Structures are given as structure tokens and as C-alpha cells.
Amino acid sequence: MKTPLFSALTASLMLSTGTAAAADWSNTQLHLNHGEFKNPFSQQEANQTIYSLQHASGYRYGDNFFFIDYSTDDLDDGYQDGDFYGEWYSTFSLGKLADLKFNDSALQDVGIVMGFNAAGDAKVMKYLPGVKLSWNIDGFSFFSTTLTGYIDDSRGLNGGGAPKETNSYMLDVAWGYPFTIGGHKFEFTGHVEYITGRDNELGGDVKGWLLAQPILRWDLGHALEMPDNQLMLGIEWQYWQNKLGTDTNESVPQIHLAWTF
């Protein structure tokens, strides 16, 4: 693991430990995903496995969310060959901080977001300040829209990483929708993000991309008489237009397994 990512993720874990202790609610999961992905720079395909630690919690001022991915594949090409990637978002709730009320409104809360994205081998660091709107929609456990900056603080070519980039913006929609069919419990969850185009330090065009990662999963634990939502099995579909800012488009089904502890 490279130094910038190690520092960022170490800070994330320390913060999550502190906030979890004082959390109003907390959820931590281990995910395993497996599918056939494409290297957008060489166009070669490889079977890739992604191990993820994901955490979400709420406390008196708002909520926190982060995940850490470890990716490995069966192609030795310098891409996703044992690499780490992580994201962290802290949201400060105006409803909680300013005692704002959204009675009888589809809008549930407004939050100020501070986030970062960090990649290991590429030595990428992005800061994402912005605004998050949480919505009250019947049937959904959560539904949010987030608009942030996408501010580059990467090491760049001189630091042995991917080229530095100009700044841009991100729009993200995330949701969770639980439902039941014939006594079996399911959840449709995921997110869709759009990040606007930018330039890199070589003068190249980094295209705006659309990334959708919907997940349909079955509560296997419930079927086995375990606690609800503890063991989930399903399919995650990744659709990525202009993957990592290239001309590559990707549509990949993945086996998805999630364990909550």
C-alpha cells in the first residue's frame, strides 16, 4: 500500500473507531465481488476479485461513510494487481446542527459533505466538498443526491503516479430499497455517479464518465434463520461509460456477497 493511501485510510479507520463508539447507529460490512473486467488502457480482460470493507454510521452531527477496496486479478499487467482504493465521506446535517424541520416534505435533510478518494498504485488523491440532499421516498430505506467538487491533489508523474488532473465536479445518486417476495427478503441498492471531464498534466483529455453500480441481493441469512441482513447474496452490475476517463465502455455482472457484523 502506498504512503498517501495508507495515511488516508489509517485516518479513516481511526475516525470510524471514534465515531462508532458514540454513534446513534452503525453498520459495518465485508463485501466480495467477482467478475471479468477490462483494463481501459490496454483493452485486455481479466477475472478480478474485489474485497471491500464498508462502514456507515450516524451520530449527533450527521453521518459518516467509507469503504476500502482491495483488488486483484489473474493478469499481470500492472493494473489492479493487488491494489487498494478507498473513499471517505463525512456529512454534517443542517437538520441536526440548525434544528431545521422538513415536515411533510419529500426533502428529509440537507447536509454539508467533506470527502476524499484515494488510490494506491496511481497515487491519486481527490477532495470532494459539497452538498448532500436526503429524500423521504416511500419504500426506500434511503435515497440521496450529492453534488461535490472533484479537486485533485495527486502526486502526478513526478511522484511516480498517474498524471495530475484539473478539477471538476461529481454528481451522485444513492439508494436502498428493501422488499419481500414470498417470504424471502431482498434489497435493491447501489449508486450512480457522473464526474465531469477534465485535462491531465500532459494536456490530454480526461473524459467525463458515468458509473452505475446497482446491486440486487437476497437475504440468504434470513432464509437460513440467521439475523436479517447479516448475509446477503446477489448480483452487482457495473456499467462504466468512459472508464477512468478513456474511450472504454464496460458492462460487467459480478457475483456479490456481503456479510454484516
Each model region followed by its residue ranges:
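Short loop/turn motifs that connect adjacent beta-strands in outer-membrane beta-barrel proteins
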Residues: A22-S26, Y61-F65, L94-G111, N136-S144, ...
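Outer-membrane beta-barrel transmembrane domain signature
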Residues: I151-Q230, W259-F261
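Cleavable N-terminal export/targeting peptides
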Residues: M1-S26
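Transmembrane beta-strands of outer-membrane beta-barrel pores
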Residues: L32-K38, Y70-D74, M114-G120, G149-R155, ...
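Short glycine/proline- and aromatic-enriched beta-strand/turn motifs that initiate or cap beta-hairpins
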Residues: A22-S71
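Outer-membrane beta-barrel "beta-signal"
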Residues: N249-F261
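Membrane-embedded beta-strands of outer-membrane beta-barrel proteins
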Residues: L53, W88, P129-L133, V173-W175, ...
